[in-house]
From Swiss-Prot:
GO annotation, cellular component aspect: plasma membrane; proton-transporting ATP synthase complex
Subunit structure, interactors included: F-type ATPases have 2 components, CF(1) - the catalytic core - and CF(0) - the membrane proton channel. CF(1) has five subunits: alpha(3), beta(3), gamma(1), delta(1), epsilon(1). CF(0) has three main subunits: a(1), b(2) and c(9-12). The alpha and beta chains form an alternating ring which encloses part of the gamma chain. CF(1) is attached to CF(0) by a central stalk formed by the gamma and epsilon chains, while a peripheral stalk is formed by the delta and b chains.
Protein name: ATP synthase subunit alpha
Protein species of origin: Rickettsia conorii (strain ATCC VR-613 / Malish 7)
Keywords recorded for this protein, A-Z: ATP synthesis, ATP-binding, Cell inner membrane, Cell membrane, CF(1), Hydrogen ion transport, Ion transport, Membrane, Nucleotide-binding, Translocase, Transport
NCBIfam families: atpA, PRK13343.1
Length: 510
């Protein structure tokens, strides 16, 4: 049987097409020096900044420095597995992490690998860790509230969806407690079917102790909040490179919800340790140090992260990503380098004071210097009705209180104002892990501002509040329902509330 030349050519072409080409061109370099989580690599002429490289042992590295004759890479893992003279190959890829609802309820590391022992994560979608922040046209102004469940915050320093609100204070003043309470408070919204009410939460632990992270996971599990929460952990024992990339990875996970018309809340705990990790990397890469030995681009480090929190426009699906960065100060010094940087990037700050904390005012929010620059637009009308005067009254009380230390004889009006202020401070106190629904907060603050507590002894204010709320939940549920559904206090509801409170105060004082 003779084959025609055309048929021979066709057969050969088919055979050639079916051959799997095994030889691939790889760009390979060599490790010149390695130590302290940094590798200097020679021979990768075309490598790009931010590209992932792979060492002989399988450990990955991230290229940060491009020099004349070598590149500097941070090692994302154990640097003991990288030796001088090892081969390093380009991957021609940037860092990506898994995103999606499959991550909810899980604890992952900075690269999105599960570390909770519950098996693999079945995520179909991956995103780059460094994404461009949405532009001005893609955004819309903040208009919906994020209810933290904390009276002092929801009434005086309200937070809106898409806002960046800094939580700042010394160590052990309750910064993480505010963040965890906010996560727990979202449980009520997740029990409803309406997707637009739900806020998915992401907690990023940067440079924390493992025991602290385990404690937070346990607390959230006990409260039933892990179902809608994801924890990204880069603890103090991990490489500085992982602590540096953890917030960016977590932000990409949060952007998945934002870009799909859902709402997410991300907590960075804390960005002081993040800046320290970046300073360590920069100094080891021999970049010139600036103020407090931080590199020159430490502002950009945080601004490019926090600018990714946004409220998206209707055309973009109306999703939002709200950021609560945490900064730890040293001896209340808010004017240090990193605190001032982050204050200038964010839309307001909640300032926690150790002095108030030790006095037993918890949450220890200093109302005088805490602000929310955009959140008041998101506050519900009922809260505006009752909380409008609280900030002024508290400021006047603080002034009179410091003034009254110098003189013992006070006129009755001043004395009454100080007593009223003390009761306001008392009603804003709250136990940890006990967030209040917004309608109950409104009733509590109404009681404080309308001077129903004047006849109640100061040490019994807390007891009064507990009993009053229990009574209203059992017998006057219609008042709470009306505030919740109407989002304002109608005249009819106010009459009912006044009648109930007058009777309750009489009974209680007896």
């Amino acid at each position: 049987m003779k084959l025609k030349p055309i048929e021979v050519a066709e057969i050969l072409q088919k055979e050639i097409a079916n051959i799997n080409c095994l030889s691939e061109l790889e760009e390979v370099g060599q490790v010149i020096t390695v130590g302290d989580g940094i590798a200097q690599i020679y021979g990768l002429a075309n490598v790009k900044s931010g590209e992932v490289v792979e060492f002989k042992s399988g450990v990955k590295g991230l290229v940060l420095n491009l020099e004349n004759d070598s590149v500097g890479a941070v090692i994302m893992g154990d640097d003991n597995q990288v030796q001088q003279g090892d081969n390093v190959k380009r991957t021609k890829a940037v860092l990506e992490v898994p995103v999606g609802k499959a991550l909810l309820g899980r604890v992952v590391d900075a690269l999105g690998n599960p570390i909770d022992g519950k098996g693999d994560i079945a995520s179909k979608e991956y995103r780059h860790i460094e994404m461009k922040a949405p532009g001005i046209i893609e955004r819309t102004s903040v208009s919906e509230p994020v209810q933290t469940g904390i009276k002092a915050i929801d009434s005086l320093i309200p937070i809106g969806r898409g806002q960046r609100e800094l939580i700042i204070g010394d160590r052990q003043t309750g910064k993480t407690a505010i963040a965890v309470d906010t996560i727990i408070n979202q449980k009520q919204a997740h029990s409803l079917t309406n997707e637009s009410d739900k806020i998915y939460c992401i907690y990023v632990a940067i440079g924390q102790k493992r025991s602290s992270v385990a404690q937070i996971v346990k607390k959230l599990e006990d409260a039933g909040a892990m179902d809608y929460t994801l924890i990204v952990s880069a603890t103090a024992s991990e490489a500085a490179a992982l602590q540096f990339i953890a917030p960016y990875s977590a932000c990409s996970m949060g952007e998945y919800f934002r870009d799909n018309g859902m709402h997410a809340l991300i907590i960075y705990d804390d960005l002081s340790k993040h800046a320290v990790a970046y300073r360590q990397i920069s100094l080891l890469l021999r970049r010139p140090p600036g103020r407090e030995a931080y590199p020159g681009d430490v502002f950009y480090l945080h601004s490019r992260l926090l600018e990714r929190a946004a409220k998206m426009s209707e055309e973009k699906g109306s999703g939002s990503l709200t950021a609560l960065p945490i900064i730890e100060t040293q001896a209340g010094d808010v004017s240090a380098y990193i605190p001032t940087n982050v204050i200038s990037i964010t839309d307001g700050q909640i300032f926690l004071e150790s002095e108030l904390f030790y006095k037993g005012v918890r949450p220890a929010v200093n109302v005088g210097i805490s602000v929310s620059r955009v959140g008041s637009a998101a506050q519900i009308k009922a809260m505006k009705q009752v909380a409008g005067s609280v900030k002024l009254e508290l400021a006047q009380f603080r002034e009179l209180e410091s003034f009254s230390q110098f003189g013992s004889d006070l006129d009755p009006a001043t004395k009454a104002q100080i007593d009223h202020g003390k009761r306001l401070v008392e009603i804003l106190k709250q136990a940890q892990y006990h967030p209040f629904p917004v309608e109950e907060q409104i009733v509590s603050i109404y009681v404080g501002t309308k001077k129903y507590l004047n006849d109640v002894p100061l040490q019994k204010v807390k007891e009064f509040e507990d009993k009053m709320l229990t009574e209203i939940r059992l017998n006057k549920k219609d008042i709470l329902e009306s505030i919740k559904n109407e989002q304002r206090i109608t005249e009819e509801t106010e009459q009912k509330l006044k009648a109930f409170l007058e009777n309750f105060v009489k009974e209680f004082v007896k």
